[in-house]
């Protein structure tokens, strides 16, 4: 009789631990990598657009302190040639797109 009681207690404990784990996973959510284009870090001068890397870094850090910024040309519509460089900010975010803070 004692062994049956110990077995049921063990099974109950396992289910409780699994239930708590599922609740924690649901509240924390999965992280994913987000990329945001920051157009206000680009300047137009003499008909050509340039990306200010210092301004790009500063704006990206405002979005997420762990964010990584880089200036990257984007392809122009309908063409395979590279277009004007724009500021991109890459950071870890939640499923809703908000930055993940640690």
UniProtKB/Swiss-Prot annotation:
One of its GO terms (cellular component) is extracellular region. Its main location: secreted. Residues 1-29 form the signal peptide. This is Putative defensin-like protein 152. PANTHER family: DEFENSIN-LIKE PROTEIN 144-RELATED (PTHR34783:SF1). GO terms for biological process: defense response to fungus; killing of cells of another organism. Disulfide bonds join 34-93, 51-71, 56-87, 60-89. Belongs to the DEFL family. InterPro entries: DEFL. It comes from Arabidopsis thaliana. The keyword Disulfide bond applies. Keywords: Antimicrobial, Disulfide bond, Fungicide, Plant defense, Secreted, Signal.
